[in-house]
């Protein structure tokens, strides 16, 4: 039996999976991925800007959303998200997300289960934002700007966690960089620093 992955031309978000046995007919399946099992919703049309940076921003947003929709945890059924704002489940996910960020900091700074050697606890602390905080916050039914910020973070944090140790081997520094990236992305996407008049 042989398996091969090949991309199809003309279909942007699908993969053709081909398998076959010797001396038998080959079959091809197309697999389509969406963020939550539903067809993707179109964003409201934005005013066209002549600059190339807006086109680049749109393309980047599209790639990030597609990648996060493919690899980030999501609902397995096509049901409405029960973690709506104001519900207990929404609060549970929110508290879980920020508590795991805090606990990750405590672990990566070697305050809980201290050791003089690198160990699993410090490693878990370093990766806590990517493993627990971002998925917990993405599980809520949050506004589209916040979901977009979390999609970007889902891709940026692993890059930071892998790249920083090449230059400075510190669990605390990696966790700190992840935290700065987290709040900087929220500030950028949610407009925390914009002036209101």
Curated annotation (Swiss-Prot):
The keyword Secreted does not apply. One of its GO terms (cellular component) is membrane. Disruption phenotype: Small plants with reduced chlorophyll content. Susceptiblility to the oomycete pathogen P.brassicae despite recognition and rapid induction of hypersensitive response (HR) but associated with a reduced oxidative burst (e.g. H(2)O(2)), a runaway cell-death response, and specific deficiencies in the expression of established markers of immune and stress hormone signaling (e.g. PR1, PDF1.2, AIG1, EDS1 and PAD4). Its main location: plastid. One of its GO terms (biological process) is positive regulation of defense response to oomycetes. This is Protein RESISTANCE TO PHYTOPHTHORA 1, chloroplastic. Keywords: Chloroplast, Membrane, Plant defense, Plastid, Transit peptide, Transmembrane, Transmembrane helix. InterPro entries: RPH1. The keyword Transit peptide applies.
